[in-house]
UniProtKB/Swiss-Prot annotation:
Gene behind the chain: rpsM
GO biological process: translation
Source organism (scientific name): Bifidobacterium longum (strain NCC 2705)
Gene Ontology MF: a single term: rRNA binding
Protein name: Small ribosomal subunit protein uS13
Subunit structure, as described in the record: Part of the 30S ribosomal subunit. Forms a loose heterodimer with protein S19. Forms two bridges to the 50S subunit in the 70S ribosome.
Amino acid sequence: MARLAGVDIPNEKRIEIALTYIFGVGRTRAKETLAATGISPDIRVKDLTDEQLITLRDYLEANYKIEGDLRREVDADIRRKIQINCYQGQRHRKGLPVRGQRTKTNARTRKGPKRTVAGKKKATK
């Protein structure tokens, strides 16, 4: 397995797909990177030369914020929003959806498993 940006990328996949294993690199950014470095998107990772891997690594590090740097930046942005007490920060703090989604129903991923609350007892006749 080749390593790019501290991530093992699978040998059997096409390089266009394998690059998406790196946090911060999706399909579009992978295509842009390959076009800029002159590497065919159809080539498999195992068929890349060391020179091509070095070119890819240098291009990604020079032009994009990926992996650890990007994760730190995202975490810092969330902490800043929480600290300045803006609406999005309040939603992050409460563990609720941040971007305006409904919460009366759904939002289970963000809210966690359902906690049953005791309700009214039915009146017997």
